[in-house]
Regions:
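Short Gly/Ser/Thr- and Asp/Glu-enriched loop/turn motifs at secondary-structure junctions
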Residues: 6, 79, 138, 234-239
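Glycine/serine-rich anion-binding loops at beta->alpha junctions
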Residues: 83-112, 130, 231-243
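ATP-binding N-lobe of GHMP and related small-molecule kinases
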Residues: 1-92, 110-120, 144, 154-155, ...
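Contiguous, small/hydrophobic- and glycine-enriched helical/loop subdomains that border
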Residues: 105-142
Length: 272
């Protein structure tokens, strides 16, 4: 069975507090984009789970951990081979690992006819990472709390988007720790207010200030893209910068920025 595992971007990411368990409270607007990894699932007779992915040890892979947990929890027969063809950059703020884990939950549910409802799948996901909870679905959403509160968010049309990744791997935990030490928490806005904002006002990311201070090359990249479009933002804790605009404008940005940074990764696609 082949399954696509779609990348996620944050159209908005505000850090609004921290709870008693030291988890950050967030207000995010997330959407999937038409850029994905491909996971191949194959049942095997031998009682073993194998995950094949370049440059990542099996035991450290979220996919392996999630699959092992579900096999134990539901006493599933035989084993499973999972091959991951990676396209989504690692440590890039695109939730590639979380998306792969969510795809695995959905795939095992389907392969073994578990008939899990969304709440049951979210409960599994919450044990491995809050980003996985949103990644179980494919619609734009307002995501709050520590990532467990999800409501559909009204975005009227699919948007053209250019992804630019500067080949920097960023550890999310480090960025949040630095944010706590240096910055104040933001005030959340009502869903109706957020849905009424135009795109330029919606696009905000509190983590940019931390990442830009540590990685000035990412700040420089954003400034250079802003010369062509105002709808530019870093996704998640970085390092990816994206721009949403008309296709003609995005093609021009791609052409001009690639002259400066030919070694960066570029993806021209659409939101889902």
């Amino acid at each position: 069975m082949l399954e696509k595992s779609y990348a996620k971007i944050n159209l908005r990411l505000k850090v609004v507090g921290i709870n008693d368990d030291n988890y950050h409270l967030l207000q995010m607007v997330n959407t999937k984009i038409n850029f994905y990894d491909v996971l191949k699932f194959k049942k095997t007779k031998e009682k073993i789970i194998n995950v094949y992915m370049k440059d990542v040890k099996q035991e450290e892979n979220l996919v392996y951990r999630v699959a092992s947990y579900m096999f134990n929890k539901y006493s599933l027969p035989g084993g499973l081979d999972i091959k991951i063809k990676k396209n989504i950059m690692i440590g890039a703020g695109l939730a590639g690992g979380s998306a792969n884990a969510a795809t695995t939950i959905n795939a095992i549910n389907k392969l073994y006819n578990l008939n899990l409802n969304i709440d049951e799948k979210r409960e599994i996901a919450s044990g491995f990472g809050t980003d996985i909870i949103y990644c179980l679905d494919n619609y734009p959403a307002l995501v709050e709390g520590i990532g467990e509160k999800i409501k559909p968010f009204n975005i009227s049309t699919k948007q053209n988007i250019l992804i630019i990744n500067p080949n920097i791997i960023i550890a999310t935990k480090d960025i949040y720790n630095q944010y706590d030490a240096l910055y104040k928490y933001s005030e959340p806005l009502d869903k109706e207010v957020l849905e009424s904002l135009d795109l330029k006002k919606l696009l905000e990311n509190d983590l940019e200030q931390v990442v830009f201070a540590k990685y000035p090359q990412i700040l420089n990249l954003k400034k250079q893209v802003l010369e062509y479009s105002s709808n530019v933002l870093m996704s998640g804790s970085g390092s990816t910068i994206y721009v949403i605009d008309e296709l003609k404008t995005l093609k021009k940005i791609y052409k001009e920025i690639k002259k400066i940074y030919p070694e960066y990764k570029y993806v021209l696609t659409k939101t889902r």
